[in-house]
Amino acid sequence: MLGRLIKDTTQFVKSSTKFGIVWGPKLAPWGITLGLGAFYFFQPKFLFKPLPIIGSNYLTQKDLDKMKKEAAENSQ
């Protein structure tokens, strides 16, 4: 009973590892492409907020100057 369970578990680990070795490199580019596409489509604010230009949420030079001015006023 226990020997059969160990054999089945070992076989499952071996087949899963072989599947990952064979299909991992083939599917990785698709995963990267879909992940970046999801970031572009959803644009999470926690990730893109520090960046000045993302999609239609861009900062103009006037906005950047205003931010610098406010930062200088807050530091004094």
Swiss-Prot record:
What residue ranges are annotated as transmembrane?
Answer: 20-42
**Record GO biological process:** protein insertion into mitochondrial outer membrane
The compartments listed are:
Membrane
Q: Which UniProt keywords apply?
A: Membrane, Transmembrane, Transmembrane helix
| CC terms in the record's Gene Ontology section | mitochondrial outer membrane translocase complex
- The highest taxon in the source lineage is Eukaryota
Look up and give the membrane topology term: Single-pass membrane protein
Q: What is this protein called?
A: Uncharacterized transmembrane protein DDB_G0283573
